[in-house]
Amino acid sequence: MDVQAQRPPLLEVKRNVELKAALVKSSSRVPLSASRLKRGPDQMEDALEPAKKRTRVMGAVTKVDTSRPRGPLLSTVSQTQGHTAAQKGPKKTGPRGCSAIGTVLRSQKPVPAAPAQKPGTSTAPVVVGKRAGKRPAWDLKGQLCDLNEELKRYREKTQTLELENRGLREQLREVQEQATTLGTERNTLEGELASVRSRAEQDQQRLETLSARVLELEECLGTRERLLQELQGERLQLQEERSTLSTQLEEQERRFQATEAALSSSQEEVVCLRQKTEAQVTLLAEQGDRLYGLEMERRRLHNQLQELKGNIRVFCRVRPVLEGESTPSPGFLVFPPGPAGPSDPPTGLSLSRSDDRRSTLTGAPAPTVRHDFSFDRVFPPGSKQEEVFEEIAMLVQSALDGYPVCIFAYGQTGSGKTFTMEGGPRGDPQLEGLIPRAMRHLFSVAQEMSGQGWTYSFVASYVEIYNETVRDLLATGPRKGQGGECEIRRASPGSEELTVTNARYVPVSCEKEVEALLHLAHQNRAVAHTAQNKRSSRSHSVFQLQISGEHAARGLQCGAPLNLVDLAGSERLDPGLHLGPGERDRLRETQAINSSLSTLGLVIMALSNKESHVPYRNSKLTYLLQNSLGGSAKMLMFVNISPLEENVSESLNSLRFASKVNQCVIGTAQANKK
């Protein structure tokens, strides 16, 4: 196709406009009319102004972007408008965008190409309407009107072309966006393709590696099979040889070979057993270290728990009503539920008392006064011995861990102190007291700790302090009942450990030995008949158990005393009664008991107040127990009271003393380790 035929109609329009402008600007040879001759230069310029405007419009029309590829344009206004409406429809984009470009290109209707022109010739402008004919050269006004009409038509056509141009630009922008999207997709797909190719190469390499490994294993398997066949053949050959050997020499050689094989196998077994033994020893050492660490952590947490509970704790126990005793009135003793509700063990009790003095003065019934007390734990009359021991089992464990421990039983005579510490009649395991139960617990735990490398030894002693005199309750033979020679001394100069001279220190290792010692001490203890109790303990009994532990593998040692003290019962004597020889003895005993108990209270208060001087020496009891009462010890006091209303005064005194002790704090306990 000729180049001239491919020119767009817009260039042809531009060329026709330029020709028209030249025609307007050219001077005509027709004489001007009078009206035209009368016009001045300004009026001529106004007359020619439409031509100038038409020239500027044509110049603006010619400023079309020719940098992009030219496609076929629509030839008519209706085609352009239809094409513009088509562009406003929904755009459909295919998977790769190629179909969208094809749709845009197909939507453009081709314009019939102009006939080919020869060089140097111009194409006549497209005339939409018909003119009457060519005006004469002198009819400039008519020519001007024609040109204005033609300019109007060209303006309309220019607007149409501008609309078409905007539509084409919009199409171009959409195509460019689609091309950008397709380029991005292409880059993404190329990256995915590269990744897939990389993985394929890696899989191929792995496949090659695995194939090589398979070949290697197949080769190894073939070698093993050949070796197995060779060995089987050799075995058959040896069997044939053995069956064919008949001489004594060959028989001896066979036996020699068998002996060598057995020896080699035995040596291999020995080596294997040695390795296993070494591994077991290593594992045992590791487990021992771990077990030791866990044991130390248990001791630390156990001691921390005991410190949180308090290094001085007070438990209250109310004995049950015995046969022949009057039942107390309802509401005399009330046990409120624990802090967590009815299921929680009680920690307080309320005691009601009527004021007889006020009743005597006024003559009216005395009102009831209620006294409330709170302790770490309260045991009602129905509490069992096992339940009581469960509360102090952790404290007994602290003694095994190296902390000095002292447990008191305090209260008036007949309140159940001895029953709490030693228990009831022999032979009934349900009535065993704290001492036999504590010993059973210590022996059991020591046996378990032996598997961790700990070795424990226990040495027991049992003394009583009667009228400030120390007596050995384990004395036998001629020394039985003669405790005046016992004195409290230092074990060695400069040592903090105390010992009782002339007292028996018996090593114990089982429950039967402890039971025999308790039976002997029970027979030797000083008792007397009082108004409150037919067999009242008139002395303080102190059961001391010195615990020594050693871990030879780690070079550790620990030791601490466990003191279980049954304090003497207090009982007031009527000062108006005539004192016979027996009553004078009871008075001296009561004075000594009250003095030692008062000193015990002063010592505890001094320790709580961090006083520089603690009056340990004011009493034999506190002097003997001073290493178990200080800041490095743990102490527990049982206050035993009677449930009878006739003993309400003594019960109140005991509860008030116990409340003072419960408010004391003696500091942080420390283990005795070396």
From Swiss-Prot:
Pfam families: Kinesin (PF00225). Gene3D superfamilies: 1.10.287.1490, Kinesin motor domain. GO terms for cellular component: early endosome; endocytic vesicle; kinesin complex; microtubule; mitotic spindle; nucleus; spindle pole centrosome. GO terms for biological process: cell division; minus-end-directed vesicle transport along microtubule; mitotic metaphase chromosome alignment; mitotic spindle assembly; negative regulation of centrosome duplication; vesicle transport along microtubule. InterPro entries: Kinesin-like_fam, Kinesin_motor_CS, Kinesin_motor_dom, Kinesin_motor_dom_sf, P-loop_NTPase. SMART domains: KISc (SM00129). Disruption phenotype: Centrosome amplification as well as multipolar spindles. Cells overexpressing Kifc1 show a single microtubule aster and growth arrest in prometaphase. Residues 336-345 have a biased composition (Pro residues). GO terms for molecular function: ATP binding; microtubule binding; microtubule motor activity; minus-end-directed microtubule motor activity. It is found in: Nucleus; Cytoplasm, Cytoskeleton, Microtubule organizing center, Centrosome; Cytoplasm, Cytoskeleton, Spindle; Early endosome. PROSITE patterns: KINESIN_MOTOR_1, KINESIN_MOTOR_2. Residues 311-664 form the Kinesin motor domain. Keywords: ATP-binding, Cell cycle, Cell division, Coiled coil, Cytoplasm, Cytoskeleton, Endosome, Microtubule, Mitosis, Motor protein, Nucleotide-binding, Nucleus, Phosphoprotein. Residues 75-84 have a biased composition (Polar residues). The keyword Transferase does not apply. ATP binds at G411, Q412, T413, G414, S415, G416, K417, T418. Its main location: nucleus. Residues 66-96, 327-366 are annotated as: Disordered. Residues 146-315 form a coiled coil. Minus end-directed microtubule-dependent motor required for bipolar spindle formation. May contribute to movement of early endocytic vesicles. Regulates cilium formation and structure. Binds NUBP1 and NUBP2. Interacts with PPP1R42. This is Kinesin-like protein KIFC1. The gene is Kifc1.
